[in-house]
Amino acid sequence: DAVITEISDSDGRNELEVPAWDLDGRLKQSNNEWWKSLQDVFETLGVSNKKFNLRVKPNIPAAVGLGGSAAIAVSIIRCVSKHFKLDLTDPEINDLAFVCETAAHGTASGIDNTIATFGEPLVYQREPSTIIETLKFEKPVSLVIGISNTPSLTAEMVAGVRARWKENT
């Protein structure tokens, strides 16, 4: 699995730990926009008053453009849905993860949360109308991913691309 999330009941405050990414803290007291969006998701799901701790174990490095924040959001939402017997569908999980991605990146494309939710190669289009189609291959396809070990935040990259696009249009 790309991300494993464990949930446990708590008698105190809600906490989120992502040790591999050096993230931990109390959900309600965080100033991080992504964590705030998780709290909004929990309110939407009706579990914000429940006491629980989340421990997330990503097998994706942070800030390398591989959709790690989306994978974590999807994993957390699935875990909470299962724990509280909410029976969320993949489209519902995808919509909620998109909320987290928008908070994390400002303007999210939707591709990362969609791939993380459905877990298979897809054709994805957000506008003018959403298209999600599974890609089928007759033979296995090799995929090579290079990681430069130079972290960069997607939100900063998106903002830079948007600024250059506006300058040239």
What are these regions (language model features)?
Residues 3, 7-48, 57, 80-86, ...:
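C-terminal nucleotide
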Residues 1, 63-73, 107-120:
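FAD-binding core of FAD-dependent oxidoreductases
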Residues 52, 57-64:
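Short pre-catalytic strand/loop immediately N-terminal to key active-site residues, enriched for Gly-Thr
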Residues 66-86:
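DPxDG-like acidic metal-binding loop motif
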